[in-house]
Amino acid sequence: MEEDFQKHIRSLITENVLIVVEGVKDKNALNSFGITNIITLNSPLFSVVEHVAEKTKECGVLTDLDKEGKKLYAKLSSDLQRHGVKINNKFRNFL
């Protein structure tokens, strides 16, 4: 399991996948693993979606895995895809 986790982390780093997270603590946790291409949801959702769509054509969305986090993930993923951004779920599915 730990080896798989490290493999996924290395993949995110080498592919330089943009990751969208809910807050600063999430960002800091990913930073501690060497992941730096991160955006936090610190502005209105539509603004984040537009910013991501301008910056990349593929990103990962790592929201909390509770009920609210799953609802946020669904909304964010849907909006991003409507703006032409492919959602990379490899790491989220691993978790």
Model-derived features: positions:
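Short glycine-rich phosphate-binding loop at a beta-alpha junction
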Residues: 18-19, 60
